[in-house]
């Protein structure tokens, strides 16, 4: 990667910035009055903790004012990046589509509406890739979020955005009724031909589709029943005919651990699902949100739309599930005069904010396909990643420090040097301030809301988190394959910096919250130390 020419003293320091437990190099000999040397002294106790003895650290702090690195540790080594990948995914969408881009979800009629209000034809919702056909819609053309997104379920701190998850679907149905439609003789369809539906994103396993209703999730809030042995309480949102839940989970004594599973998921002949809830939930424990990922998002949306139409007094029949296939003959009807309902999304800038603040895997995984569909739909030789690569190459970035196969970070690797140079590139763009504000804020919101909330750096470090972990059966513990942090801060002295912090392969206990408590807080300490030390 092209780097600014540095003085011999700076280059010597960068080469010596690691100690043996961090990568095998010699300890720095620079005077303790040097900010980088003082930073090294502050970081060493963090990285020398016993829990990191088998881990590998990679760090770079980059001066945006001087266009040069001021501290680096293993800067050119590739690290498993996890959700810091979303910095590239969202940045690409922001640069190529623009902050003001809006999704237009239209509902078309394929036939005439007679005087009695009968639509003699089909009603077709054409999916536009809008990722927020949900209750995220807020006043002022904005999108809401909670710090612990409902996609990361089964955690006591997880919650859904307050409001109606079918808000947009109901609004579309109301518009159809307002057009005088009282009965539909044809089918109610959802056209998802924008890109192929069916693949599951690599983070939380939600099915990707051009239509996204409530993040393609059904939220179940499960709590204890009235007594030990009683059935648990279950609140479903949204409740539709697409899925029926059979509750076989029971209430256990206080002090036990909640354990809820979907023990079976049966597809019925009509395309609906019957899901059995099994497991236990203890007395005295606050209800917890669990999310069911719908297997066929287009069918889910179709059922929800038919339900909403009926609520508005429109007679509509739910077609057989097999009808929801192939849309080659429909686009001829997609003309302005046939629009009977339309939803225009808030600007893309709001979507970028949601994806980055809460690390929304479905949204990030879908963005490369959306960018491709919008900008190069008819060019079968190009993918969304081809468009991203072209942007990065035009920026002059060395892609030898980057590997990416999905939008969310389920399988991606970046070097700290590549990441800070990418962030430096984004900091020079017209939407730089918007991009930075969209990042989680240390100790304040998003996935950093509970990281280092009481240090001077809290409220001043804007950075995307990344976490990838799996069960280590041999040692009965959790292996944090990757933990990362990438973003920006302005020092108390007014200097601007980009940062990339990675640590790979850290073993932690299975206790809930151990990854955040041990590894997440440590990365926050590193960022906070840089904020307090660099000029």
What are these regions (language model features)?
Residues 8-20:
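Bacterial N-terminal signal peptides
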Residues 26-49, 95-399, 493, 521, ...:
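Conserved serine DD-peptidase/penicillin-binding transpeptidase domain
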Residues 48-73:
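A short, well-structured edge-of-sheet supersecondary motif
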Residues 1-7:
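Positively charged n-region of N-terminal signal peptides that target proteins for export
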Residues 74-79, 291, 408-409:
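A short glycine/serine-rich beta->alpha loop
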Residues 70-72, 167, 176, 365-535:
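Small-residue-rich helix-loop
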Residues 72-92:
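Short active-site loop at a secondary-structure junction
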Residues 67, 86-93, 188, 211, ...:
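Residue-level preference for non-acidic, small/hydrophobic
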């Amino acid at each position: 990667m092209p780097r600014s020419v540095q003085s011999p003293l700076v280059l010597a320091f960068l080469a010596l910035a690691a100690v043996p437990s961090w990568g095998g190099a010699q300890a720095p000999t620079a005077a303790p009055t040097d900010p980088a040397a003082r930073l090294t002294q502050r970081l060493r106790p963090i990285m020398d903790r016993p829990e990191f003895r088998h881990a590998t650290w990679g760090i770079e702090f980059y001066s945006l004012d001087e266009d040069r690195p001021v501290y680096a540790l293993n800067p050119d080594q590739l690290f498993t990046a996890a959700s810091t990948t979303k910095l590239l995914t969202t940045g690409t969408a922001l640069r190529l589509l623009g902050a003001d881009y809006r999704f237009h979800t239209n509902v078309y009629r394929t036939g005439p509406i007679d005087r009695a209000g009968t639509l003699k034809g089909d009603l077709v919702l054409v999916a536009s890739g809008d990722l927020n056909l949900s209750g995220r819609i807020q006043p002022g053309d904005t999108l809401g979020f909670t710090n612990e997104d409902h996609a990361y379920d089964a955690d006591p701190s997880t919650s859904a955005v307050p409001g109606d998850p079918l808000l947009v679907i109901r609004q579309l149905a109301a518009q159809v009724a307002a057009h005088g439609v009282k009965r539909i003789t044809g089918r109610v369809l959802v056209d998802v031909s924008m890109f192929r539906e069916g693949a599951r994103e690599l983070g939380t396993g939600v099915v990707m589709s051009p239509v996204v209703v409530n993040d393609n999730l059904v939220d179940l809030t499960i709590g204890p029943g009235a007594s030990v042995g009683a059935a648990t309480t279950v609140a479903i949102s949204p409740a539709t005919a697409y899925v029926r839940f059979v509750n076989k989970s029971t209430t256990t004594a206080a002090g036990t651990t909640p354990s809820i599973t979907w023990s079976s998921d049966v597809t019925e002949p009509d395309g609906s699902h019957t899901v059995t809830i099994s497991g236990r939930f203890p007395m005295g424990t606050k209800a917890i949100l669990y999310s069911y990922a719908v297997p066929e998002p287009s069918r889910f949306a179709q059922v929800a739309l038919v339900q909403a139409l009926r609520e508005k007094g429109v007679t509509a029949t739910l077609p057989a599930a097999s009808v929801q296939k192939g849309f080659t003959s429909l686009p001829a009807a997609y003309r302005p005069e046939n629009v009977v309902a339309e939803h225009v999304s808030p600007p893309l800038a709001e979507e970028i904010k949601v994806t980055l603040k809460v690390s929304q895997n479905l949204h990030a995984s879908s963005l490369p396909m959306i960018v491709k569909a919008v900008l190069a739909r008819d060019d079968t030789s190009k993918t969304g990643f081809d468009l991203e690569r072209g942007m990065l190459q035009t920026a002059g970035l060395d892609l030898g420090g980057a590997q990416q196969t999905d939008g969310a970070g389920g399988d991606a690797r970046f070097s700290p040097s590549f990441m800070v140079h990418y962030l430096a590139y984004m900091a020079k763009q017209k939407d730089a301030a918007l991009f930075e504000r969209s990042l989680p804020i240390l100790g304040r919101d998003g996935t950093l809301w509970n990281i280092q909330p009481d240090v001077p750096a809290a409220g001043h470090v804007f950075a995307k988190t990344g976490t990838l972990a799996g069960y280590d059966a041999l040692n009965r513990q959790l292996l944090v394959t990757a933990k990362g942090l990438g973003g920006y801060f302005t020092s108390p002295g007014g200097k601007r910096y980009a940062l990339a912090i990675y640590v790979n392969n850290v073993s932690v206990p299975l206790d809930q919250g151990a990854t955040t408590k041990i590894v997440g807080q440590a990365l926050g300490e590193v960022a906070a130390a840089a904020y307090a030390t660099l000029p």
